[in-house]
């Protein structure tokens, strides 16, 4: 019977003894000896080759066989021969990667490990950033598995690697040594500059130094994170410095000329120039982030949310923030940013409007109306609706519960210092199909995998604490981030696909709601089991820019049922034309997200913008249904010929009438040109269903 072995690239190949004989003969020649047929026969008699064995396993047997026969020098030569071939293969792999990368259609398509649409152009800087990624993955896995062995034993460590290699779980951001994302407090910078995190800047003293210093600080902080950097105090701090220069009532005198230069600028013009300086600077590619811009997020607050978060906040001079001027500044920035996006493609900041809900509506009527007005003007931002000021976003959709709102001069503005240290994701579609195939209750198997994931995250946390003890995490030491307020996140992917496999209809039905609650409830139960006073867990519906595509590809290759080329990151099928806008809000309502403590954002895709009244009604729908995190996604049209940007979803440029147009839309949580997406994500974007205006709720 023919025997097939597994090569290093995973391909099956017919086993031939001649290749082994040739390799052994070369090893003998390398030490000045000659292998006779009798010698070869003696060595080969130790080998046990069976179908499905890997090349590495057979070569390991050869090493042992040579030593068993007493040929120690030959065994050493054989080991060196293997090592040399390994190095040659790795070098060739890097050369092949380089060639493929430079020929790829864009940077996201060329990236082998973590395709990212935030990298707009591939060049030598992005290539330099890509080459070491495989090494970082190996290093991160070694660090983590060694810690798992120390804490839980080799068996659990091996099981983790097995689940990882078989794609039941996915470790996010393995190409980076840094922790994931953070919503930082800027108070340490306000009182000490950047010296505590390795910079040399003193604290900001005026509006000009605030803007320049803020840019530098965000770049520095982002270089020490693998994900997003949220600055929820940004506009509040800017407002403080504007007041110091132009008075607490500056917003009432916005048209007053205060610049004595030839430009004769008004207060409003100076403020808009500050907006421009900060936003355009932070949208520039950064060398410290492989030539991509920082992932920068900010928050706006209604009056009640602001009071709840910052009621006890005081600036270093003892002054409290003033709501009336901040209210004006928030609205001014939002309107400016909306208009500026018709002049240039500006991805960041990712904005979140934080609103408190009460009795089925937005409590602050002024901000409910203003939010609807900005959506109607074509602005694209997230809205977070909550019954209390319990959470902040530190990423495109990641929600972090606030455990303590108290203010401290030492640590900064209380609960806004939060985030996620690490994300580990379960592939629910594969896990559930595997369980069904093997006659295991899928609930029990999911619980088993999730239990292991919590242990792995605790091992990661110990490694992080060790880095902090060695002085390698200045953001924690300086108080920008509080390690006790950061979460270990369990990500979820393939939930909709798993439900489809089980024959469930992906609509708001009791059966589907029970399935979602049951699975997410298992994860939340484990959170409570493993939580301590020092460690917190949450669960996030993964954005899955990369892994949604990877899971579908890997599962299909291994014979699992895969209904689409990219796994959903919503509770509904994104290409389903039968669902109206209200259905989508309901499917992201409280009964579906109840156990999803780390957040899930509804991207409500619409063909065209709604009226202010319709958006206002949808805010009420969100409050009633308990849909707490959402945005409206209407592709903006960008002309490739004249550069004109239009907020509408058009087939030709309204300015020069060219049909050579591109679209600006959200790949996951952040907005980019569709042409910057990876090929797989471009296909996914083309299949999204954008609801027609008449299917929106009437008022």
Which residues are covered by each model-predicted region?
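Long, charge-rich boundary regions
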Residues: 655-699
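Contiguous, well-ordered alpha-helical segments that form the cores/surfaces of helical PPI scaffolds
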Residues: 236, 488-501, 521, 666
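Conserved catalytic cores of very large enzyme subunits
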Residues: 88, 94-484, 505, 509-663
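Short, hydrophobic beta-strand segments
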Residues: 3, 45-49, 311, 497-504, ...
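Metallocofactor- and cofactor-centric catalytic cores in central/energy metabolism, strongly enriched
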Residues: 269-272, 500-501, 686-691
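Core of folded catalytic or high-affinity ligand/protein-binding domains
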Residues: 483-491, 681-682
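Charged, amphipathic alpha-helical regulatory modules used
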Residues: 1-107, 482, 686-690
């Amino acid at each position: 019977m023919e025997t097939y072995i597994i090569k290093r690239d995973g391909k099956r190949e017919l086993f031939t003894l001649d290749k082994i004989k040739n390799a052994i003969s070369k090893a003998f020649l390398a030490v000045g000896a000659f292998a006779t047929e009798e010698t070869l026969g003696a060595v080969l008699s130790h080998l046990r080759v069976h179908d499905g064995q890997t090349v590495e396993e057979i070569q390991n047997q050869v090493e042992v066989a040579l030593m068993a026969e007493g040929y120690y020098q030959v065994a050493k030569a054989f080991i060196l021969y293997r090592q040399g071939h390994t190095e040659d293969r790795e070098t060739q792999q890097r050369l092949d990667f380089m060639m493929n990368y430079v020929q790829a259609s864009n940077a996201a398509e060329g990236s082998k490990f973590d395709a990212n649409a935030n990298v707009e152009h591939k060049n030598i800087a992005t290539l330099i950033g890509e080459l070491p990624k495989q090494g970082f993955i190996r290093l991160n896995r070694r660090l983590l598995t060694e810690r798992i062995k120390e804490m839980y034993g080799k068996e659990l460590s091996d099981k983790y690697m097995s689940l990882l290699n078989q794609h039941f779980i996915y470790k996010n951001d393995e190409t980076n040594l840094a922790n994931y994302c953070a919503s930082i407090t800027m108070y340490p910078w306000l009182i000490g500059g950047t010296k505590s995190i390795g910079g040399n800047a003193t604290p900001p003293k005026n509006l000009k130094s605030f803007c320049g210093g803020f840019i530098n600080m965000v770049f520095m902080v982002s270089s020490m994170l693998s994900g997003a950097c949220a600055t929820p105090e940004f506009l509040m701090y800017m407002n403080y410095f504007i007041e110091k220069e132009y008075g607490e009532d500056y917003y009432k005198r916005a048209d007053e000329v205060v610049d004595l230069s030839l430009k004769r600028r008004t207060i409003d013009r100076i403020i808009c120039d500050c907006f421009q300086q900060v936003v355009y600077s932070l949208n520039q590619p950064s060398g410290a982030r492989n030539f991509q811009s920082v992932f920068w997020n900010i928050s706006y607050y209604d009056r009640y949310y602001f009071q709840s978060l910052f009621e006890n906040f005081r600036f270093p001079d003892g002054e409290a923030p003033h709501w009336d001027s901040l209210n004006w500044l928030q609205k001014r920035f939002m309107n400016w940013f909306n208009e500026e996006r018709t002049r240039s493609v500006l991805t960041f900041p990712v904005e979140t409007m934080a609103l408190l809900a009460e009795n089925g509506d937005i409590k602050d009527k002024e901000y409910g109306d203003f939010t609807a007005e900005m959506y109607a003007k074509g602005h694209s931002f997230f809205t977070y609706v909550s019954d209390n000021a319990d959470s902040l976003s530190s990423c495109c959709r990641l929600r972090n519960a606030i455990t303590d709102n108290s203010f401290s001069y030492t640590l900064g503005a209380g609960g806004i210092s939060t985030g996620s240290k690490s994300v580990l994701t379960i592939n629910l579609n594969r896990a559930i199909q595997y369980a069904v195939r093997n006659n295991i209750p899928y609930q029990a198997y999911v619980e088993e995998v999730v239990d292991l994931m919590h242990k792995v995250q605790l091992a990661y946390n110990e490694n992080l604490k060790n880095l902090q003890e060695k002085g390698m995490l200045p953001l924690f030491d300086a108080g920008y981030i509080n390690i006790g307020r950061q979460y270990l996140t369990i990500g979820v992917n393939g939930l909709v696909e798993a439900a489809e496999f089980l024959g469930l209809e992906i609509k708001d039905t009791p059966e589907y709601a029970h399935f979602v609650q049951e699975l997410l409830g298992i994860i939340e139960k484990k959170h409570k089991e493993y939580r301590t006073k020092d460690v917190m867990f949450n669960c996030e519906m993964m954005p899955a820019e990369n892994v949604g595509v990877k899971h579908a590809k890997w599962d299909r290759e291994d014979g699992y049922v895969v209904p689409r080329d990219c796994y959903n990151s919503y509770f509904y099928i994104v290409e389903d034309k039968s669902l109206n806008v209200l259905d989508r809000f309901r499917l992201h309502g409280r009964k579906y997200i109840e156990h999803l403590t780390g957040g899930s954002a509804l991207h409500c895709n619409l063909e065209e913008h709604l009226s202010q009244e319709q958006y206002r009604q949808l805010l009420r729908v969100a409050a009633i249904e308990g849909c707490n995190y959402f945005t409206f996604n209407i592709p903006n049209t960008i002309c490739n010929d004249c550069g004109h940007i239009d907020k509408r979803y058009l087939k030709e440029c309204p300015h020069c009438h060219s049909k050579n147009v591109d679209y600006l839309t959200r790949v996951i949580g952040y907005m980019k040109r569709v042409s910057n997406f990876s090929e797989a994500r471009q296909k996914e974007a083309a299949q999204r269903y954008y609801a027609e205006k008449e299917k929106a709720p009437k008022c």
